[in-house]
A protein has these predicted regions:
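Structured, contiguous alpha/beta core segments that scaffold functional sites
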Residues: 2, 6-14, 18-21, 146-318
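Short, well-ordered loop/turn elements at secondary-structure boundaries
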Residues: 135-138, 213, 230-231, 318, ...
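Alpha-helical structural motif
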Residues: 12, 26, 67, 72, ...
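Extended, helix-rich architectural segments
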Residues: 1-200
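C-terminal anchoring/interaction modules
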Residues: 1-22, 30, 47, 304-540
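Short, hydrophobic/amphipathic alpha-helical patches that form generic packing surfaces
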Residues: 70-78, 276-294, 457, 473-480
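Generic recognition of flexible, low-complexity loop/linker segments
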Residues: 126-131, 205-208, 221-223, 463-465
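Long, contiguous amphipathic alpha-helices that act as assembly "spine/axial" helices in icosahedral shell
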Residues: 101-146, 270-304, 338-371, 380-414
């Protein structure tokens, strides 16, 4: 590829990146606010405290949001990807093949689990970061890469600020433009043979290694191939030197993006997070927490914060104290309180907003998972069903956009590294399905289990009421009323087979009873014949 083609290709990708960035630009102010409120390093303000000498200290505002995010990640992990639970399996859709070769798929499935949760894997750490990003920003990008030395798939949740993305007509994200800024030294770790144009031209003859510490911008483009269906173009571009470092065609995309939810009236590929819906409440909580701390200071020490209130009243919108003049025995200004804050009301507001954040991020539900008090099996079933239904909207989307593609990508990468257990030759070209079976999905199925239990209780009561009820028709009616899954009911053919089996069993029972009667009659006749013979002998 000559320099003109390179420039043309780089210009095309730059234009495409700018277009995708314009779609993301509207979200950037919101992302900044979320980062400030969800990151404890940014959730500080400064107050003045008089204790002998006046010193500058930092006090933290309410950190409910930041502290709830790890708990939310734990909730999602326990319901979607728990380490101690086999949350997916692989099966052949053909029942005969599954019965004969299903154990080979089970070995493959077990291999994936062992690799994913081994000591060399960072899967759990990556998923924890992913769930927090999903809750805070509404979307995430997971990168899968190959560790050829250990034949291990590596996982990493990347910062969303590095990406602009686009989705296809089915609503799946399949286009990634990732921009990373670092030094050429970092770039050489990924591409050891690459040297930028200015180095090749001899710009650094006096100091041959000086260019390694210069900053550069790397653009990585991954998008569906325009020439081959099912393939992806992967292009690495040095935007500082305006050179294409590498251009390859890959059988898969190593990035996976998903969203918490999306706006139905827009075409934007970026997600809408649970925290976005309560962002005004979170901001108010931090403001009220500041007011509560300030009111507490005024109630305990009237001289505290007086300087802030008088010198910078615009920062707080009100003046709560005034200096009367003069100093006390310790050299502090005399202060009079103009308006005392209502601390119980402020405290109530803080608690209300804290509860709103916890409810939004399912934290209270996570705490109920840790409850140790005894409960009945029915109560436990209903509680598990409730948790599954609450998380279902977000969990179903994660399963569809993340977990299913991730498992397929894991299998493809392990196959490339020749690490998977081998299949039999008879299975070449056969198709198998990946079935998700995590605690969330099982909790949703408890609706049907509970309905089946209620149907059994009702049917038992009906049988005791009146003999005029037709039990078979009653079963059909109750199954329809309780919405029992058809999979647990007999089909018409199965019903006919059961009736035929019952009829045959009845006929066999009748034949056995008849045979018993005939045998008893023969025995009686035999006994009668013996008795008659004895009588004749006596008469003779």
């Amino acid at each position: 590829m000559n320099s003109y083609e390179n420039e043309e290709l780089i210009a095309r990708y730059s234009k495409r990146k700018q277009y995708l960035y314009s779609m993301k630009q509207n979200y950037l102010p919101i992302y900044q606010e979320l980062a400030i409120l969800g990151d404890p390093r940014n959730a500080y303000f400064t107050v003045r405290r008089s204790n002998g000498d006046i010193s500058q200290v930092t006090a933290k505002t309410d950190d409910t949001l930041q502290s709830c995010l790890p708990l939310h990640a734990a909730v999602m992990n326990s319901l979607l990807t728990p380490a101690a639970y086999r949350w997916h399996s692989m099966v052949f859709p053909d029942n005969e093949i599954q019965e004969q070769y299903g154990d080979q798929l089970a070995f493959q499935n077990e291999f994936i689990y062992k690799k994913r949760y081994s000591s060399l894997s960072n899967f759990t750490c990556a998923m924890n970061t992913l769930y927090m990003s999903n809750a805070l920003y509404g979307w995430y990008v997971l990168e899968l890469s190959k560790d050829l030395k250990h034949k291990q798939v590596c996982y990493r949740t990347l910062p969303i600020k590095e990406f602009v993305i686009d989705q296809n007509e089915r609503g799946f994200v399949d286009t990634f433009y990732r921009t990373v800024k670092f030094t050429y030294r970092n770039l050489r770790q990924r591409f050891p043979k690459y040297m930028p144009k200015k180095v090749r031209e001899g710009t650094y003859q006096d100091n041959p290694y000086a260019w390694l510490d210069e900053n550069m911008e790397l653009l990585h483009v991954v998008e569906p191939s325009l020439t081959k269906a099912g393939k992806y173009d992967s292009i690495y571009i040095d935007m500082t030197s305006r050179e294409i470092i590498q251009k390859t065609e890959e059988p898969y995309c190593k990035y996976i993006a998903g969203r918490a939810s999306t706006f139905s009236n827009t075409n934007d590929p970026y997600g809408f997070s649970p925290v976005m819906s309560i962002l005004p409440s979170v901001k108010n909580l931090n403001a009220v927490a500041f007011d509560l701390i300030k009111a507490t200071h005024h109630a305990s020490r009237l001289d505290l914060l007086a300087g802030d209130d008088i010198i910078n009243p615009r920062n707080y919108q009100d003046v709560t104290s005034v200096i009367n003049g003069g100093m006390d025995s310790e050299g502090r200004p005399q202060v009079s309180v103009l308006a005392q804050r209502d601390m119980p009301t402020l405290d109530y507001m803080v608690q209300a907003w804290q509860k709103k954040i916890k409810d939004t991020l399912f934290v209270d539900m996570f705490m109920s998972l840790q409850e140790t008090q005894s409960r009945s099996a029915t109560d436990a079933m209903l509680k598990a069903n409730e948790r599954a239904n609450i998380v279902a909207p977000m969990g179903d989307r994660i399963a569809r956009e993340l977990l299913q593609p991730m498992i397929e990508l894991e299998l493809a990468m392990y196959a490339e590294m020749n690490a998977l257990p081998q299949f039999s030759k008879e299975l070449k070209g056969k198709v198998f399905d990946i079935v998700l079976d995590n605690p969330m999905l099982r909790g949703q199925r408890l609706d049907s289990a509970n309905a089946l239990l209620n149907m059994g209780n009702t049917l038992a009561q009906v049988q005791q009421m009146d003999t005029e009820f037709n039990i078979d028709r009653t079963k059909i009616y109750l199954a329809s009323a309780y919405n029992i899954p058809q999979t647990v009911l007999n089909t018409e053919d199965e019903k006919s087979a059961i009736v035929a089996a019952k009829q045959q069993q009845a006929q066999e029972q009748m034949m056995m009873e008849n045979a018993g009667g005939i045998g008893s009659g023969i025995k009686n006749l035999t006994d009668a014949g013996v008795n008659m013979e004895s009588l004749n002998q006596q008469q003779a």
